[in-house]
A protein has these predicted regions:
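Solvent-exposed loop/turn segments at secondary-structure junctions
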Residues: 3-6, 20, 35, 46-50, ...
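Short, solvent-exposed amphipathic alpha-helices that sit
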Residues: 21-25, 50-69, 83-88, 114-118
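Structured segments of extracytoplasmic/periplasmic soluble domains
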Residues: 28-36, 62-66, 87-95, 118-122, ...
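Hydrophobic alpha-helical
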Residues: 59, 73, 77-143
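Hinge/cleft segment of the Venus flytrap/periplasmic-binding protein
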Residues: 43-51, 62-63, 156, 160-206
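Short beta-strand elements in bilobed, periplasmic/extracellular small-molecule ligand-binding domains
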Residues: 39-42, 63-81
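Flexible loop/hinge segments that line or gate small-molecule binding clefts
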Residues: 1-20, 31, 39, 138-146, ...
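Structural recognition of the beta-strand scaffold that forms the well-ordered cores
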Residues: 1, 13-15, 39-44, 72-74, ...
């Protein structure tokens, strides 16, 4: 995201709460493991990107209350499938062929989709032997959930333009000034609604 200090330069901004997105995955994991020890490997986004910083922060804040959950390795996968796969391969090799890993948390779905491939190639079952949690809600993550290979994703709404255009139309119509900041909803999706969400994405042109 772009940080503009002079707020007079824009009418409104529509954005997601990236810290909350990370927190929702952390909260889900706490419930999922129910007090059992869980070693997490983290696939970070692009180094220095505010989205990556915030998603890391939110997850870390959530699991701070759960001493049974530890991040044992964390490295940038640069928000790509290929890099996510490559880094996950190194995590698996470093952690007893993945046997020491309970969950992979990725700052976006693409990296976790790459990680899923690495997990399978190591002879493990993604979604079972190694849990997955990620952010964005892209169609392929719902496909992975349907296949039993992914566990949780927080949707980054694809409709950010909607509220922005609504604000612009109101301003043009009667001069109504919108709020400076509109935060879109962050929703955690699990396999039980994956088919439904995938159909919605198809209808939106994904």
């Amino acid at each position: 995201s772009i940080d503009v200090k002079d707020k007079s330069l824009y009418m409104t901004t529509v954005t997601a709460d990236n810290v909350l997105e990370g927190k929702l995955i952390g909260d889900w994991l706490i419930k999922q493991v129910d007090g059992k020890p869980c070693n997490v490997v983290e696939l970070q986004g692009t180094v220095g990107a505010s989205v990556a910083i915030d998603r890391k922060k939110g997850f870390a804040e959530a699991i701070a209350s759960a001493p049974n959950i530890k991040i044992i390795r964390s490295q940038s996968g640069d928000f790509t499938r290929s890099k996510g796969k490559e880094v996950m391969e190194s995590f698996i090799k470093a952690e007893n062929n993945g046997k020491n890993i309970c969950m992979v948390y990725a700052h976006n779905d693409d990296m976790v989709i790459g990680a899923i491939q690495a997990i399978k190639e190591a002879g493990l079952k993604p979604g079972k032997d190694i849990l997955t949690g990620s952010i964005d809600g892209v169609p392929d993550i719902y496909k992975a959930m349907i296949d039993g290979e992914a566990n949780a994703s927080v949707e980054l709404t694809p409709n950010m333009a909607g509220p922005a255009f609504d604000a612009l139309e109101k301003f043009k119509k009667d001069g109504t000034m919108p709020e400076k900041l509109t935060i879109t909803k962050s929703i955690l999706y699990l396999p039980d609604t994956a088919k439904e969400e995938l159909e919605k994405k198809k209808n939106m042109g994904y």
